[in-house]
């Protein structure tokens, strides 16, 4: 699977699991995304896909690296629907 395809799948999963914030952008907590069974089956390296999407300015989140447990409450915001 190529990175662009995984990023597009990630956008769909954020839209499925997330909700709109005050600015009208879709947000989801990292823990919700990480612990979702469907996401676990789709993404071999979820954190790598998140970093690739962040570099492409498709999503935004605080920090550079998200770790399970430690960063479960970090918001991932979809910048491009």
Swiss-Prot record:
This is Costars family protein ABRACL. Signal peptide: none annotated. It comes from the Eukaryota. The lineage of its organism: Eukaryota, Metazoa, Chordata, Craniata, Vertebrata. Belongs to the costars family. One of its GO terms (biological process) is regulation of actin filament-based process. It comes from Salmo salar. InterPro entries: Costars, Costars_dom, Costars_sf.
């Amino acid at each position: 699977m190529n990175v662009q395809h995984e990023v597009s799948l990630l956008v769909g999963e954020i839209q499925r699991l997330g909700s709109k914030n005050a600015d009208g952008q879709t947000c989801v907590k990292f823990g919700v995304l990480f612990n979702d069974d469907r996401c676990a089956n789709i993404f071999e390296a979820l954190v790598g896909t998140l970093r690739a999407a962040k570099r492409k300015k498709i999503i935004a989140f605080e920090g550079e690296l998200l770790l399970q447990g430690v960063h479960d409450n970090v918001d991932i915001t979809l910048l491009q629907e």
